[in-house]
Amino acid sequence: MVKMNVETREELASLIDHTNVRADATENDIERLCREAVSYGFRCAVVTPTNVRLAAELLEGTDVTVCSVVGFPAGVSTPRVKALEASEAVENGAGEVDMVMNIGAMKSGNRELVYRDISGVVDAAGVPVKVILETAYLTDKEKVEACLISKEAGAAFVKTSTAYGGLAGATVEDVMLMRKTVGDEMGVKASGGIRDLETALAMIDAGADRIGTSTGVQIIEGWR
């Protein structure tokens, strides 16, 4: 099983996707997000599709990757729409994509639609795709199946949550289950409710190799 050995704050920062996907995020908010991402050495700046171009311009020439959410937050767009959204995000400068899978299809046992939903984005994007399972909605059996479909469809990561609308975010138990299911061949991103250093390190110890959070600065500043 993948287990990250984080010994410095710089190593921790390199695992963090610094995130602002708020509906009311202003250009000033995105500028601040990108400044912080560069200053602290975060892995990605995660934004909504409308802010990808701005973030890409701000981060040009840096080591920070722009990541766009797709099908966010509910995952209810059709596969064709998600694929188009992903393609446009990459054209505008995204180097990674975090997509919300079709949760209703997963709950209905419609494996074919879930696969088509994910593989369409993977093919259209041509960059690493992280599949948001929204674990709060799923049984353990469904979490395992969603991980296996994501792996089969060519995704680079499985991700716990959007944490949107008050839903529960990442748990250590879910991260452990996801890591056990995908093995060493995929990444596992923990996201949702990770607001302090202790929680971030617990997720990494459970098997996460990426952390999604809007409080990356506070997490890193907590390192002493």
UniProtKB/Swiss-Prot annotation:
Q: What pathway or pathways are given for this protein in its record?
A: Carbohydrate degradation; 2-deoxy-D-ribose 1-phosphate degradation; D-glyceraldehyde 3-phosphate and acetaldehyde from 2-deoxy-alpha-D-ribose 1-phosphate: step 2/2
Instruction: Kindly list the places in or outside the cell where this protein is found, as annotated in its UniProt entry.
Output: Cytoplasm
Main location group? cytoplasm
Provide the GO biological process annotations: 2-deoxyribose 1-phosphate catabolic process; carbohydrate catabolic process; deoxyribonucleotide catabolic process
One example of the protein's molecular function in GO is: deoxyribose-phosphate aldolase activity
Provide the Gene Ontology terms for cellular component.
cytoplasm
Pfam name, any one: DeoC
Q: Keywords for this entry?
A: Cytoplasm, Lyase, Schiff base
Catalytic reaction annotation: 2-deoxy-D-ribose 5-phosphate = D-glyceraldehyde 3-phosphate + acetaldehyde
Q: What is its EC number?
A: 4.1.2.4
Task: Report the active site residues.
Answer: 98, 159, 189
Classification via InterPro entries: Aldolase_TIM, DeoC, DeoC/FbaB/LacD_aldolase, DeoC_typeI
Q: Which family does it belong to?
A: Belongs to the DeoC/FbaB aldolase family. DeoC type 1 subfamily.
Protein's job: Catalyzes a reversible aldol reaction between acetaldehyde and D-glyceraldehyde 3-phosphate to generate 2-deoxy-D-ribose 5-phosphate.
Q: What is this protein called?
A: Deoxyribose-phosphate aldolase
Natural source organism: Methanothermobacter thermautotrophicus (strain ATCC 29096 / DSM 1053 / JCM 10044 / NBRC 100330 / Delta H) (Methanobacterium thermoautotrophicum)
The record lists the lineage as:
Archaea, Methanobacteriati, Methanobacteriota, Methanomada group, Methanobacteria
Gene behind this chain? deoC
